[in-house]
């Protein structure tokens, strides 16, 4: 619709105007009657409305249509009309390699790859992440392809410089085809860096063209999309549109003839190519009428005359009839074959569809040879029944372009290929054989786990049953059946084996063989499983322990995702158990039986045991679980960090049923949960950080000893003294009711040592009383086994401490130090050892380093040196100190919040401890300032009191009486206030502002202060008591006597109250005898000596000196009723 103002000059209008002119009288001015077209259908103008103005709505509609028809800014930037605001990113081959590999891996089957445009905004956002090689690919593969084109196009200098491309076009001439010589000369002039990138792009393009039946991208289409990016013209060139034709043809020529242009470029065969030579020949036959498909046996010219590339010398000449350049077949056309041609030394032919001969004239065009020109120079020995031209798939070459026939006996390869293609397995892709792909497909079919991100997948063996009970049962059955004959045993075994289900026997035999073949499994465990199989008949006959004494190993897949841990049963191929990362409480690794570990569910308290063939799989599994817990902490910050614990699972659980760590009983779980609420872990209870005596007393109604747990195994760490002859640990099976003193005597009896010189302590140094039994500390109720230290009083640090030689890294922080030998505690976590070592060497940031064991294993922060054999196998070792290499995350969206949360937690923890220290220091300063202020005010009051005697001496007799009377009333009020209970409580609470000394403990020696107490109040006297006790002089005694006389007079005059008026009662009171001598009054009111004594006592109370300590005020390590005291008294 035309919206411009126009005048309607129709024929009828002209006739009407001429008639009006004829009838108009002369002298009148003629006025043309113009008709204005309508601006909008909504506005109605009459013919008489001359020069009407359009409305605002019509103008707005016109402008909106004009603005909507304008191209977008991105289109203008893409067409080089506007200059892009984005700065180009430096071209790097490493990034080109990453992008091309991703496209070759995921985008070969994408229809219209590089041709279909993605989201411009998403492409720009993805393109801006190209500053580093650690990029995260988007879901849409078209965005990746668009970003690759944008990355090459936005460079300030193209891959082929402008001058070189202009000279290349001038050599071809006007409308001339791309020749082999011209393109080879151009590639030889390009810099090696740019040439390497061009080869990588051509390789990706060839691989995509080989899959053109799926992605619909042949060599011509790839030339169209890559031509403007590789061969660019100047933006200001007048022939920019004509030059675009040469850029597209050049890329297509490079793709089709890459073997001749780039002889060193090798492109692998992926096995998923879909193009065949037959399809390419049919396409060329349809596009070029002068090409005929061979249907009969043909003989071509010699290879020397057909392969050599020759340039056309008569492109512009007149006489010879030259057809356009025939499209060469790309390398992807040799996907399948039907016959195997044999090279012929020389032959003649009338037509050659590959080389591009003209049938009418017989001349050969000046085109570079295609990859099929090598095959075109051959002749077949048999008649071709089909139109397929086959290739050899068993050649030693890595590229199908170099496939040449090997031997005439390989002519029957067609039958073999047909057999292979008929197999259903040949139609399957590589990912179809991946168990991770199958499990992810299984999850996608579910409703709640459809969007789970899969991290890792592990194949392990799940242990069903109890290894410890099997060990105990097999030992008892072996002794009971030792007198039986071998024939009876074999018959019973064979009879019971038939009754056993086949599934259990097969799983046991397969899993047990894997255990026996694994050399790293402990020998006792192997014997244990073999004995369990041999005694299966006896186990089945025992109905009470049938379920508890059978151990089965079931193959299970553990699939770890971003939110959950899935357990897939391989027998039923279904999800058996789902464990969220937030419910995973702990993972424990057995240090004796390599490959055995357990996982504890924090909600259901279900403990599952697993076995892996390679112990290194456990490290990978633990890392994935720790990563999942760190992500779960982002939403629930109350979760604790997951750390694997390493200790002997089977040995520490002996007799406990193997259901818990550290040998604890199932009945004691409420006790450990109650301690966990107070911040104590199971390790703290095991090491004796908690006062076990108080714990057992508090939970005595739960911790009830049973007769089965009377005998427990206790391991003692012995001191490094010559009497023990190099033995550092020893285990005993003891009764839980045995006293500590008897145990010490038992240990020292064989070594012929004096028991009074030794003590028993926990791993953390808490002393066990000699008159207490181990059951009082929780043995038999909290633990089924325990670990204690035997301490020699002469050398208390010799137990559990060993010399370790640390090899230092060659970094500037250590200032050339090569090694350092120190004595460390073998049962202390490595993070404490590292902190002590770095503090001694004055090296900051001890958490930047980790220790490498003697066998090259990397130890964790919570590992102990006893787990690698220190103190068990050897008494000294060498360890290497190395700097940690922090990994780079592959998923910034998940890793960055996780690392940020860890760093924030560390900063908050350090800041909180610093705040606590500053808070305590501030309280100390405030208390000191308050005490200083009180002392200063006391001196001020003393200075004021010095003027009181002089002022009282200046008073008259009556004024003195009133002063004494007011002073006595004030004294009585103070005495009344002291008798009020609420006032006393307020005074007592004010004393508790200053923290008192901690209560004495029987385990640690503390100084007991003996301060004088008044009225049973406490160690600090009140100021009122100090004042009354110190200021005893005649003046105050006189005031007290006057008060007594007044009370007696009031009692004596009670009978005369009816005759004496209330207003005259004061006149009948006997006057108080007062001394009139001013000097005596000044002497009585001299409070200076009392005040000075008050200040002195205040200073003594504020600064309590402890330099002189009485020996009887120090507690002994052993209580009064201990047998140690009886032993010492007996010696005396």
From Swiss-Prot:
**Which Gene3D superfamilies does this entry report, sorted A to Z?**
Rho GTPase activation protein
Keyword annotations from UniProtKB, A to Z: Cytoplasm, GTPase activation
> Does this entry carry the keyword Cytoplasm?
yes
Report which superkingdom the organism of origin falls in: Eukaryota
Q: What are the Rho-GAP domain coordinates in residue numbering? A: 76-262
Give any Gene Ontology cellular component. Answer: cytoplasm
| Pfam families associated with the record | RhoGAP (PF00620)
* Kinase as UniProt keyword: no
**Which GO biological process annotations does it have?**
small GTPase-mediated signal transduction
What PROSITE patterns does the annotation carry?
A: RHOGAP (PS50238)
Question: Where is this protein found?
Answer: Cytoplasm
Q: Where is this site: Arginine finger?
A: 115
Which spans does this entry mark as compositional bias, Low complexity? 281-301, 328-354, 473-498, 507-517
GO MF term list: GTPase activator activity
Biased composition, Polar residues: where in the chain?
302-311
The record's function comment reads: Rho GTPase-activating protein involved in the signal transduction pathway.
Q: What is this protein called?
A: Rho GTPase-activating protein gacE
- The organism encoding this protein is Dictyostelium discoideum
What would be the name of the gene that encodes this protein?
Answer: gacE
